[in-house]
Amino acid sequence: MKKNYEVMDGNTAAAYVSYAFTEVAAIFPITPSSPMAEYVDEWAAKGKKNIFDETVEVVEMQSEGGAAGTMHGSLAAGALTTTYTASQGLLLMIPNIYKVAGELLPGVFHVSARALSVHALSIFGDHSDVMACRQIGTAMLASSNPQEVMDLGAVAHLAAIKGSVPFIHFFDGFRTSHEIQKIETWDYDVLKSMIDMDAVDTFRKKALNPERPTTRGCTENPDIYFQRREAANQYYDKLPQIVECYMKQVSEATGRNYQLFNYYGAKDAEYVIIAMGSVTEAIRETIDHLTAQGEKVGLVAVHLYRPFSAKHFLAAVPATAKTIAVLDRTKEPGANGEPLYLDVKECFYGKENAPVIVGGRYGLGSNDTTPAQILAVYENLALPEPKNQFTLGIVDDVTFTSLPQKEEVAMGGEGMFEAKFYGLGADGTVGANKNSVKIIGDNTNKHCQAYFSYDSKKSGGFTCSHLRFGDAPIRSTYLVNTPNFVACHVQAYLHMY
């Protein structure tokens, strides 16, 4: 595949790849997913063609619930349909998602995962919203950075069509959705060559049509409801192999290795972290630091979360693993553990010489997760009795769940240039830095990364732009802590920060 690189964020990557497979887009805006729908709407208005040589039909509804209802109806009518959402918006879609999954319709929900309103509202990122959907019956595919959003977004659409199961393709709100990187984009002709047109034809033949009447959405009595519900098992049993097949095709086309569960680290690792989402990038960076010192550490990065294939997961974990930490970016009060932790525990249940497994929470509401915190996890795993149900990045002086805070360690490596720009919301600092990164990324061989931290106010609030440039791909999915350059555009900040 001819390589074409562009500077874009995760939302743009999701919009770009989803547009290729979409005939109808049902949209309603919600932070931080809104740019995905905005780009699709803009491209459709300009007449951009998908892989079927059609312009996407965009339908903006009155709410997320309406968008999900539109998606259900559109899929039932035989149109490949996509939507984009997050947080409370995803929760409003759940009643319709049950129908889409129950009827085995190949829709795709691209979700920039965001915190839910609990004790307080938060517009920032974690996995609280997508974890509320894990029992519905959709497949769930996780991406860790903008490049993975581009690549695995394609896998989500391709596998949904061939497997006849809807997908939730999710990535971390703000940390991935708004992080700008220089990434490789797809040629739509390559994507077209991958799609199973026989599966597309089968889907379209099942569309509601007065010439071929069928009964759907009816009431079933106890004599058949249970048995018909179990009939869907075959689709979910086949899905991991379908996803694996498309991941292999994407890997061959791009040169990047994608598996249901990607292992990274020492071959004989004794201490292993299981995680998904953007934190896996920071963990990889930390592993490089530790293995250079001879430490036996590793990571299993989860991509296909549902269906959770125990066979593929156990094959990815080194046989030498003594202690495992499972990191969840959500909190489930009252449960014996968080979702991913319980899935991992279940996989090892009854196995001989099973490793010790502990769980921890991190990153709720976009709380920053740094290499120092990852180092604390590995140090905890090396203890004779590692702490279970721990937290990272906070000081819990009430229930004492937090691991000890460690001093930050610079992980960027040689050739990395880091900069911080302090500004005021709507003063132009963020916009100028976005343009600077795109100019440098588009006109040099440098890899680039830009992330912008700010509060919930539209304008007049604190902003800080975190920019990195380097000769190698940048995996630092956390705020800049050791900048080479600092600019302060608000004089009052000199006395505040």
Each language-model region and where it sits:
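Glycine-/acidic-rich phosphate or pyrophosphate-binding loops and their flanking alpha/beta elements
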Residues: 7-13, 248-271, 402-416
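Anionic-ligand anchoring segments at beta-strand to alpha-helix junctions in alpha/beta enzyme folds, i.e.
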Residues: 24-60, 267, 272-303, 415-482, ...
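A short, small-residue-rich loop immediately preceding and capping a beta-strand
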Residues: 24-27, 56-59, 74-92, 106-111, ...
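Conformationally flexible catalytic loops at phosphate/diphosphate-handling active centers
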Residues: 52-56, 167-262
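A structural-propensity feature for long, helix-poor, extended segments
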Residues: 62-64, 119-138, 310-332, 452-490
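Conserved thiamine diphosphate
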Residues: 123-173, 197, 346, 350-365
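Terminal amphipathic helices with adjacent charged low-complexity linkers/tails
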Residues: 172-213, 315-353, 358
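Peripheral docking tails and interdomain loops at the edges
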Residues: 323-412
